[in-house]
Amino acid sequence: MFKDFFNRTKKKKYLTVQDSKNNDVPAGIMTKCPKCKKIMYTKELAENLNVCFNCDHHIALTAYKRIEAISDEGSFTEFDKGMTSANPLDFPSYLEKIEKDQQKTGLKEAVVTGTAQLDGMKFGVAVMDSRFRMGSMGSVIGEKICRIIDYCTENRLPFILFSASGGARMQEGIISLMQMGKTSVSLKRHSDAGLLYISYLTHPTTGGVSASFASVGDINLSEPKALIGFAGRRVIEQTINEKLPDDFQTAEFLLEHGQLDKVVHRNDMRQTLSEILKIHQEVTK
């Protein structure tokens, strides 16, 4: 009896904890800042252009919300809305991933293009949306951007492009890489016509996008703390066998080293663009 008592297996006691992901932030009503973790009302955050009230972190804006923020009400006309990607390399499950992102975002591709007016001044615009395949650049992105640039050239309009991309889209291989040169040629024609191109880099702008149309603006702007670069930090450190500065590949680092003209807070975005367009309008009269 006593032998059995001492050999008896003790039952382990566990505390059951609910998954915090399920009840941390009410869906749709509240939004958590990805940087400081502060929880805010989604509506109030949207009114502040998705800039955190606590830490000033610039949370990503959707393409349509950004266009709304920089244009006169009702002035935006979208181009090539229905253009979608094919699967030229028969890459496994690529089309399924495209369809999933289309359902999630309501977009057909990772860029929205068209014309709009800001304080009565007409301009062409392209806005990348990183929710769709991380804004990766494929054939459709290249084609849509080239079409709006060519339209701006033919109609003598300034052009504003907001970049947000992880780079080239690997599922389209060399066709994706070709878009770097293709978009650059269209921008060269736009420049040769004496027209203004404003490149506005947002978080993140990397890879083939940073090495092509994002870096060749007549004026290059960026949002605070945006990640901007070509290769990843770890790859560079391993290649050169050196430790990089903590602020390497940030907008502020690029501004300090002459690769940006200005870092613009999102609340100043509309006013800054309006002032630049007014100057361009005056000198081209």
Curated annotation (Swiss-Prot):
Keyword Lipid biosynthesis assigned: yes
Designated name of the protein: Acetyl-coenzyme A carboxylase carboxyl transferase subunit beta
Residues in C4-type zinc fingers: 33-55
Localization per record: Cytoplasm
SS bonds (residue pairs): none
Keywords: ATP-binding, Cytoplasm, Fatty acid biosynthesis, Fatty acid metabolism, Lipid biosynthesis, Lipid metabolism, Metal-binding, Nucleotide-binding, Transferase, Zinc, Zinc-finger
Residues that bind Zn(2+): 33, 36, 52, 55
Catalytic activity, EC: 2.1.3.15
Assembly notes: Acetyl-CoA carboxylase is a heterohexamer composed of biotin carboxyl carrier protein (AccB), biotin carboxylase (AccC) and two subunits each of ACCase subunit alpha (AccA) and ACCase subunit beta (AccD).
Species for this entry: Staphylococcus aureus (strain COL)
Catalytic activity line of the entry: N(6)-carboxybiotinyl-L-lysyl-[protein] + acetyl-CoA = N(6)-biotinyl-L-lysyl-[protein] + malonyl-CoA
